[in-house]
Amino acid sequence: MKVLAANVGSTSLKFKLFEMPEETALCEAKIERVGSRDKAIFAYGSLVTGKRYRLEGQCIQDYTTGIRMFLDALVSWEYGVIKSVGEIDRIGFKTVLSKGFYGVHELTDEVMDGMRQYLFIAPVHNAAYLEAIGQFNSLLPDVPKIGVFETAFHTTIPTERRI
């Protein structure tokens, strides 16, 4: 099973594709300065072949463009580690927060609505995640998307230590 891990920042994207259950990393990519017309950086590396490349001065105006660049590299003849994006079985996101959801959840419409409801608490990160997840839903609609919410950590804090 191939699992794509995605970390979406306010102006960055990071990806790593794993073969599971072996936990073998197949490739990784990093995009910095998303939103830039001419200063974005795209770095990709195959951990199978060791081939890497880095593009600087790129126009990556939104997460959609960055995600497409990554998926193109993932299946490219020279650098790709899979033949088709259809080989991706799951996509996991390190998400921030969603109203009423903690821990690990499939990113259903209900969970996404909870993320929208908390945009006022995490406007930068939740907005970025909503855009990226929406793009993956458009490009890979049949692939389950899973969110690991950071707020799960706080559920383990003893009551007497909570503020």
Predicted regions and their residues:
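Glycine-rich, N-terminal phosphate-binding loop and its surrounding beta-alpha-beta segment
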Residues: 47-94
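A structural motif corresponding to the C-terminal end of an alpha-helix
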Residues: 132-145
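Short beta-strand-loop/turn "lid" adjacent to the catalytic site in phosphate-handling enzymes
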Residues: 74-125, 146, 152-162
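Conserved phosphate-coordination/catalytic loops
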Residues: 61-64, 123-127
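Extreme N-terminal starter segment of soluble prokaryotic enzymes
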Residues: 1-4
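A short acidic Gly-Thr/Ser loop motif
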Residues: 6-11
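Short glycine-rich, Thr/Ser-proximal phosphate-binding strand/loop in the N-terminal lobe
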Residues: 12-61
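Internal, well-ordered alpha-helical segments in soluble enzyme and binding-protein domains
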Residues: 111, 129-132
